[in-house]
Amino acid sequence: MSDATSSKPQIFSIQDLKQAASDKMSQMYRDYYNGGAMDNITLANNEAAFDRYLLRPRVLRNVSNIDMTTTLWGTKAALPLGVSPSAMHRLAHADGEVGTSKACAARHVPMILSALSNDTLEDVSGQSSDGSTPYAIQVSPFKNRQITTNLLNRAKAAGYKAVVLTVDAPMFGRRLDDLRNGFSSGGLGGGIPDLSFDTSATWEEKIAWMKSQTDLEIWVKGVTSPLDAQIAIEQGVDGIIISNHGGRQLDTTPATIDILREIAPIAKGKTRIAIDGGFRRGSDIFKAVALGADFVFVGRIAIWGLAYDGSNGVGLALDLLINEFKLCMGLAGCSKISDISPAHLSILNARGVLESVY
């Protein structure tokens, strides 16, 4: 075996991938992608919280043919997994968002493209040559509404199925590592000239305006309160994404998987429920579905894949999660998504007794 071959990292898990990718990035960009707000308490808790939910497999079930497929934005998806919006993929690798999209399209994994992308939305969705992979465009409440209108019109023309409005970032969180490193994005290839956010935006006005601008599905990303989930339902959004921005906005907010357990009983059947934050294993996806999520999104994982090996690295990251999720379904006795239920989870209470999650 050559020295080059023997020194190549062995990637068997997302944690392996994170380490290998982090080793390849400069400290500034590594800290930008990997870090969170203030003391990183929410960032750490997002991951740790999954360990509080214990799997309860069912046995002697026919799992000879496991069907992971589901639907999102009216389109078939390979499994309840997609890529969250994250800015400036080219900071991780020259393949950028196009490289991420290429890996997603090859696996029919949905992708939400950030408004702060380096590559154009047309080039990104163009990686799905037959249009079978669903895409959504993410927008923020920009003061300059023409930016949003232009993005919505372009997205519609390019075959996008939904718009995802980020609602938890009226201003940027305080990220200490970025301040220490003097972080600079190096410019945005997407060419958006005015990134000022409208800090006066409200539910009633913003959702009504969005509906007046597009017939794409409208989802809101950044819901962490049951009260806001109820308002989202009342405003008639097509879906909510339970998200604390990967712990990058307001530190010490709860882990998203715990929030899902709180919101799912309120929102299930009234609007679609998705979640991101802290997912690192296929079993984490399974746990979210068992708690009531229709879909799971991951952000940093795609970035780690890019940093490690460009588009091929994103494919490796997705394959790890796909294979782990399929294995978890089989070992838990589930042959299709609808088989996954709260009965597949327990929590250990303070007295050391297993309890149902609902």
Swiss-Prot record:
Oxidase; part of the gene cluster that mediates the biosynthesis of fusaric acid, a mycotoxin with low to moderate toxicity to animals and humans, but with high phytotoxic properties. L-aspartate is suggested as fusaric acid amino acid precursor that is activated and further processed to O-acetyl-L-homoserine by cluster enzymes aspartate kinase FUB3 and homoserine O-acetyltransferase FUB5, as well as enzymes of the primary metabolism. A 2-oxocarboxylate binds at residues 32, 175, 248. Residues 6-350 form the FMN hydroxy acid dehydrogenase domain. GO terms for molecular function: FMN binding; oxidoreductase activity. Belongs to the FMN-dependent alpha-hydroxy acid dehydrogenase family. It comes from the Eukaryota. The active site is at 245 (proton acceptor). The keyword Transmembrane helix does not apply. It holds the Pfam family FMN_dh. FMN binds at residues 114, 138, 166, 221, 276-280, 299-300. Its EC number is 1.-.-.-. This is Oxidase FUB9. The keyword Plastid does not apply. Fusaric acid is phytotoxic to plants such as cotton and banana. It has been shown to induce programmed cell death in plants. In addition to a mild toxicity to animals, fusaric acid exhibits acanthamoebicidal, antioomycete, and antimycobacterial activities. Pathway: Mycotoxin biosynthesis.
